[in-house]
From Swiss-Prot:
Enzyme class: transferase
UniProt cross-references to InterPro entries, sorted A to Z: Phosphoglycerate_kinase (IPR001576), Phosphoglycerate_kinase_CS (IPR015911), Phosphoglycerate_kinase_N (IPR015824), Phosphoglycerate_kinase_sf (IPR036043)
Family, similarity comment: Belongs to the phosphoglycerate kinase family.
Name of encoding gene: pgk
Binding site for ATP: K197, E314, G340, G341, D342, T343
Name of this chain's protein: Phosphoglycerate kinase
Catalytic activity: (2R)-3-phosphoglycerate + ATP = (2R)-3-phospho-glyceroyl phosphate + ADP
């Protein structure tokens, strides 16, 4: 992937507009989870160190486009940045017709989704964004799969359009895992439905050596292999699809599972051999023997891609499978990449973030990249680099 990189540019005295993903949860006017802001900070600091006049933009939530809403304001993010950087970070609401920023200064623009035409990627709005800067930096991998005014349109019209360090690192890590992975490669794909991850499963089946499935997805594969799944969540209409995938790649199946009679925090967990699953059982995790088997497979892998917990880990009695695999990935010498919202929550819960080679900040963008789809915001940066 050939894109201009912000790290290679001379930014001294330049007006630099950086698109970050600062779409963080806010509770009572305070940032509730700062992971995305922390991921963006090095880029912002680097632009300031390079002597740029720095303008940062992002979306937050899903406001009605073109209308201000206090609950979707980036004010809590501006407050957080001021504290984190030890300097005043003004939140600018009216910026489309120009804003005064000096070299070494930093401002945060109000939610881009308050601007009409943002989601439709309107040229008129994109040209206004582009006119604000000498250099546009796309650093928000989490929104790279969306062609919007502040992610794609502005890159079309800006004098210079480059990838920020965070975006560049995501693309490098994903390329390393998917374009020419060190072998053997194992992928863990879990979730409630095969239908939502079908493209991911198909794409990975052609690059990985072991495809470990979990959650409702695993139940569909178990049913395809003729095993009882009781009243577990599965998709009978996709049994043939599961068979076709299993014919292309090794899909190791659970030999034991953790079941319950109901889906609840107070539900009693019972370990059963797969053949003993009763008609009124719900499979909510992989069993200890299966977890040990899968951990052994991961130990011998050189590349690991992890998307999704293998059980209902939010309830501790159904979290052991995910915990064992998380620890196995952490202990492995393989290049490991993890992505997707629930996966990040599991990484947090089991404290393995430092041992995973790369944790992707993008949910939908991560999955679309794995599916082999073109990410519009990356494609436009490549086009501009060629020109």
């Amino acid at each position: 992937m050939t894109v201009l990189k912000m790290t290679d540019l001379d930014l001294q005295g330049k007006r630099v507009l950086i698109r970050e993903d600062l779409n963080v949860p806010v509770k009572d006017g305070v940032v509730a989870s700062d992971a995305r802001i922390l991921a963006a900070l090095p880029t912002i600091k680097l632009a300031l160190e390079k002597g740029a006049a720095v303008m940062v933009c992002s979306h937050l939530g899903r406001p009605t486009e073109g209308e201000f809403s206090a609950e979707n304001s980036l004010k809590p993010v501006a407050d957080y940045l001021s504290k984190a950087l030890g300097r005043d970070v003004p939140l600018v609401a009216d910026y489309l017709d120009g804003v005064a920023v000096q070299a070494g200064e930093l401002v945060l623009f109000e939610n881009v989704r308050f601007n009409k035409g943002e989601k439709k990627n309107a040229d008129e709005l994109a040209q206004k964004y582009a006119a604000l800067c000498d250099v546009f930096v796309m650093d928000a991998f989490g929104t790279a799969h969306r062609a919007e005014g502040s992610t794609h349109g502005v890159a079309k019209f800006a004098k210079v359009a480059a990838a920020g360090p965070l975006l560049a690192a995501e693309l490098d890590a994903l390329g390393k895992a998917l374009k020419a992975p060190a072998k053997p490669m194992a992928a863990i794909v879990a979730g409630s439905k095969v239908s939502t991850k079908l493209d991911v499963l198909n794409s990975l089946s052609s690059v990985c050596d072991q495809l470990i499935v979990g959650g409702g997805i695993a139940n569909t594969f178990l049913a395809a292999a003729g095993h009882p799944v009781g009243k577990s969540l599965y998709e009978p209409d996709l049994v043939d699809t599961a068979k076709a995938i299993a014919a292309k790649v090794s899909v190791p199946l659970p030999v034991d599972v953790v079941v319950a009679k109901e889906f609840a925090e107070s539900a009693e967990a019972t370990v059963k051999a797969i053949a003993d699953v009763a008609a009124d059982d719900m499979i909510l995790d992989i069993g200890p023997q299966t977890a040990a088997n899968f951990a052994e497979l991961l130990k011998s892998s050189k590349t690991i891609l992890w998307n999704g917990p293998v059980g209902v880990f939010e309830f501790d009695q159904f979290g052991n499978g995910t915990k064992v695999l998380a620890k196995a990935i952490a202990d492995s010498a393989a290049f490991s990449i993890a992505g997707g919202g629930d996966t990040l929550a599991a990484i947090d819960k089991y404290g393995v973030s430092k041992e995973i080679s790369y944790i992707s900040t993008g949910g939908g963008a991560f999955l679309e990249f794995v599916e082999g789809k073109v990410l519009p915001a990356v494609a436009i940066l490549e086009e501009r680099a060629k020109a």
